[in-house]
């Protein structure tokens, strides 16, 4: 997903840190291999290159995230759209962006013509999605949060009672720290944002069974 991760945890039993690190990395590698737009051989990029009319087989993580993404797209009437990749790139963001800046009107028209979550045909029963032709998926707005969720499930499965998990600015905290307090994170503006505006007033958020997305 073109980013980093970190985990802080509390456990009554001693864990093998190297084994735990490797297990977390391996689980996230599975997510990355399916949904990272930063890897040309990832499943999502192979779907984006598929020919019009092709049915593309989905592995479990990809299917779950895409299903949720399409549900949110429908519920938000397209305010959330996992097919926005051409527009994201046109404005200079994402893994395949060129120079950041205002795109030419003709480029925006061309990009918009390839955007539309409703063009996708998802066959959940057979774990596949149909490429309508030229549609490019980008699940960056949801895949990192999913990565946090799968790490949390892994830690709980290993008996870890409390943890703060962060993947590229998406955080989830559960349980309490050794001193009995909740996990706390500081949210503040980046230096670039502060230079351009008044910025965001710093806030401390307590996370106990709660998540927060701070990126982008």
Predicted regions and their residues:
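Mature catalytic core of soluble alpha/beta enzymes
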Residues: 1-216
């Amino acid at each position: 997903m073109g980013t980093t991760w970190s985990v802080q945890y509390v456990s009554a039993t001693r864990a093998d840190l190297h084994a735990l690190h490797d297990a977390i990395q391996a689980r996230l590698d599975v997510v990355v291999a399916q949904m990272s737009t930063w890897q040309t051989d990832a499943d999502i990029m192979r779907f984006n290159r598929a020919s019009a009319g092709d049915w593309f087989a989905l592995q479990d993580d990809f299917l779950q995230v895409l299903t949720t993404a399409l549900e949110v797209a429908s519920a938000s009437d397209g305010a959330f759209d996992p097919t926005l990749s051409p527009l994201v790139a046109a404005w200079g963001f994402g893994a395949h962006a060129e120079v950041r800046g205002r795109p030419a009107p003709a480029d925006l028209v061309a990009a918009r013509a390839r955007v539309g979550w409703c063009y996708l045909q998802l066959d959940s029963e057979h774990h596949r999605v149909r490429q309508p032709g030229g549609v490019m998926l980008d699940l960056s707005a949801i895949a990192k949060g999913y990565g946090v969720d799968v790490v949390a499930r892994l830690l709980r499965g290993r008996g870890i009672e409390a943890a703060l998990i962060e993947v590229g600015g998406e955080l989830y905290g559960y349980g309490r720290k050794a001193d009995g307090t909740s996990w706390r994170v500081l949210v503040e503006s980046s230096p670039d944002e502060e230079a351009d505006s008044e910025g965001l007033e710093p806030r401390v958020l307590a996370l106990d069974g709660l998540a927060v997305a701070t990126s982008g």
